[in-house]
Amino acid sequence: MSSGRIVQIIGAVIDVEFPRDSVPSIYNALKVQGAETTLEVQQQLGDGVVRTIAMGSTEGLKRGLDVVDTGAAISVPVGKATLGRIMDVLGNPIDEAGPIDTEERWGIHRPAPSFAEQAGGNDLLETGIKVIDLVCPFAKGGKVGLFGGAGVGKTVNMMELIRNIAIEHSGYSVFAGVGERTREGNDFYHEMKDSNVLDKVALVYGQMNEPPGNRLRVALTGLTMAEKFRDEGNDVLLFVDNIYRYTLAGTEVSALLGRMPSAVGYQPTLAEEMGVLQERITSTKEGSITSIQAVYVPADDLTDPSPATTFAHLDATVVLSRDIASLGIYPAVDPLDSTSRQLDPNVIGQEHYDTARGVQYVLQRYKELKDIIAILGMDELSETDKQLVSRARKIQRFLSQPFFVAEVFTGASGKYVSLKDTIAGFKGILNGDYDHLPEQAFYMVGGIEEAIEKAKKL
């Protein structure tokens, strides 16, 4: 246990001088004496000086304070004791429910599983959300990104997915709140409590008001807990909200560490940092990690380096669109922009594949005809195009669905729609079985039976 002293403080970055024969290794955790602060070594500057990031507030720290090297990376509690608890980046409980009852702790920096250890699978994960199950189905053990700008419904979609999957799936879940609003973390906790699934979820929060060190490492803390469950042979769900804030924290830290910024001011190590995190989120022969990540898209620009880097790692992408949200269609998933590796007739079956592609064709054609309709009106279209437009508008409305987690806002009770019912409903619309129903009947309903009932009342 070598000790050193603080020689410089720049915001969240602190330089510590050690004797030259006992300089701590990269990623070692250091403890500041007389303060609660933990530091993580990022660079060795030479002459016994290391540059560190503070995992917590740097208020009250000053030059000359003693710092002790713990000789290991930051470690966090893992295992069943973490379920139902809220923890911070260091694994300390922040829910005022006493200490976490476990001896076992794992370091947050771990190697990704080797190629030989990894296992792939084609099992589908049913979410009960029509548009997702139809157009961008999730794979069990896959990675999913929810992309969207500010206020189009990433977190609400995420909470609905957690609710549906946690209740239907009955496995363990880990939720990492990375740089999001504390209010959302609070809502989320109560939502889990009310749904009686809190005893299956471990919650790790590093919210918006935390220093960049916490926001940078909290995703790794959550991932480490998920890896422990996976290695015990479980199928785990890992939810990260929001992966963009992880990148942003890296940007803040990178500038303070004195690295030269790259495109749009991001850190030069953006792709590597993202890779280190994403490569660990994988399924092995022991168990699987299915991860669902919300990705904030700055200024609705999907070509921004941060979302663009994230795209490369995902199996399915759910793109939320402001244009669709402005039509009042929620979830505001863009069925033409969202994709999945699972959308393959050999994986999901021919019927599902044909229905999904049929829906996309009709919506794409409607999009092309919109300009003609805007200039010349519906009357100038051929009969087949008129029919197609009518079906497209029904499909568009049928892609909406009331959510359980939004019941308090909308007053409409949530709906879980099985994959079988989803395919049957859209197939019927494509085949013209419901051409006689008004399009309002398809808005904000669950299965097609409900639309038929609703039409009778209109």
Swiss-Prot record:
| Keyword set, alphabetical order | ATP synthesis, ATP-binding, Cell inner membrane, Cell membrane, CF(1), Hydrogen ion transport, Ion transport, Membrane, Nucleotide-binding, Translocase, Transport
Q: Name one GO cellular component term.
A: plasma membrane
Keyword ATP-binding present in the record's keywords: the answer is yes
- Class in the EC hierarchy, top level: translocase
Q: Which reaction does it catalyse?
A: ATP + H2O + 4 H(+)(in) = ADP + phosphate + 5 H(+)(out)
Residues holding ATP? 148-155
Is the keyword Electron transport in the record? no
**Classification via Gene3D superfamilies:** 2.40.10.170, Bovine Mitochondrial F1-atpase, Atp Synthase Beta Chain, Chain D, domain 3, P-loop containing nucleotide triphosphate hydrolases
Q: How does it sit in the membrane?
A: Peripheral membrane protein
One annotated GO molecular function is: ATP hydrolysis activity
Q: Kindly name one Pfam family recorded for this protein.
A: ATP-synt_ab
Q: What EC identifiers does the entry list?
A: 7.1.2.2
**Subcellular location per the Swiss-Prot or TrEMBL entry:** Cell inner membrane
User: What is stated as this protein's family in its record?
Assistant: Belongs to the ATPase alpha/beta chains family.
Q: What does this protein do, in the record's words?
A: Produces ATP from ADP in the presence of a proton gradient across the membrane. The catalytic sites are hosted primarily by the beta subunits.
Report the PANTHER family cross-referenced here: ATP SYNTHASE, ATP SYNTHASE SUBUNIT BETA, MITOCHONDRIAL
Subunit-level organization: F-type ATPases have 2 components, CF(1) - the catalytic core - and CF(0) - the membrane proton channel. CF(1) has five subunits: alpha(3), beta(3), gamma(1), delta(1), epsilon(1). CF(0) has three main subunits: a(1), b(2) and c(9-12). The alpha and beta chains form an alternating ring which encloses part of the gamma chain. CF(1) is attached to CF(0) by a central stalk formed by the gamma and epsilon chains, while a peripheral stalk is formed by the delta and b chains.
NCBIfam families cross-referenced by the UniProt entry? atpD
Q: Output this protein's name.
A: ATP synthase subunit beta
* Native organism taxonomy: Bacteria, Pseudomonadati, Pseudomonadota, Gammaproteobacteria, Pseudomonadales
